Amino acid sequence: MVPYPPGTEPDILARDLGVHLNKATGKVFVIENRPGANAIIGTDNIAKAKGDGSALLMVDSLAVSTNPLLYSNLPYKWEKDLKPVTTVAGVNLYLLVRNDFPAKDYKEFIAQAKKANGDTNVGTGGRGHVTHLGMGLLAREEGVNFTYIPYKGMAPATNAILGGETDAMLVGGILASQHVDGGKIRVLAVGADKRTELLPNVPTVQEAGGHANSIPTTTFALFAPGTTPDDTVKEIQEKVDAALKKLTSELETVPPDSFNELVGRVATEGN
């Protein structure tokens, strides 16, 4: 289950992973997209599914842990109804601006945003989406104000900046690399400790003169229904780990115990 539209980064990762799991296990893994409500619709579907190892959720782990802070009437309780399996990929976020935005680099972008005093329009994948929270973090760290424009997913948000409707946004590397040569956007910085192989000409936010923590990273992860036995979760994690080693992307998995601690810590810090 992918609670995002087709063509988004978690969808692409899930489909790549599914191909390798099909080969490794001989079982057919079907990718189902149920986007909406900042991943709540698809997440609820898995929260209520049978815990027999046949249903998994590929989701931004921040959405799981921060949605309870943003929405008071969630149809599930993630601590009880979902069980962390493993991370699939840590994803760097890149700051994009429309090509004609009057700033040639990150420092000028911040200066322009301060001068605009809230009139810089920032597109996001929706209320509470990691791109919304990420731009909020950037605003706090750099002391600027933005006008946030939520869209129903990353596809319309990306189309908006390509069409000049918004000034800036955060995206993952796959989306950034798809559009960087089109002449309609520019990539100013990446939230990473070092430059990435995907876009080596893009400086880190610290290299670009910003605060080191201004642009966060995110993690796409697998969850199982909360009733899934621990030994089944461990078996799934081992198969996923083996499948990930065959992918060409730089991915890192985390064992279920430490991943559970990670998700819990994110929620605690959010509170």
Locate each region found by the language model:
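Extracytoplasmic "Venus flytrap"
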Residues: 1-14, 36-38, 123-130
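Short, well-ordered beta-strand elements
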Residues: 1-5, 29-30, 55-58, 83, ...
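Hydrophobic residues within well-ordered alpha-helices
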Residues: 7, 46-47, 135, 161-162, ...
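Short, polar/charged alpha-helical segment
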Residues: 7-26, 132-140, 179, 241
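Hinge/capping helix and adjacent helix->loop/strand transition within the periplasmic-binding protein
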Residues: 21, 48-54, 69-156, 168, ...
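Short helix-initiation/N-cap motifs at beta->coil->alpha
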Residues: 34-42, 91, 126-127, 149-159, ...
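A ligand-binding cleft/hinge motif common to bilobed small-molecule-binding domains
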Residues: 62-73, 137-141, 168-202
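C-terminal lobe and pocket-closing loops
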Residues: 104, 176-250, 254-257, 265-271
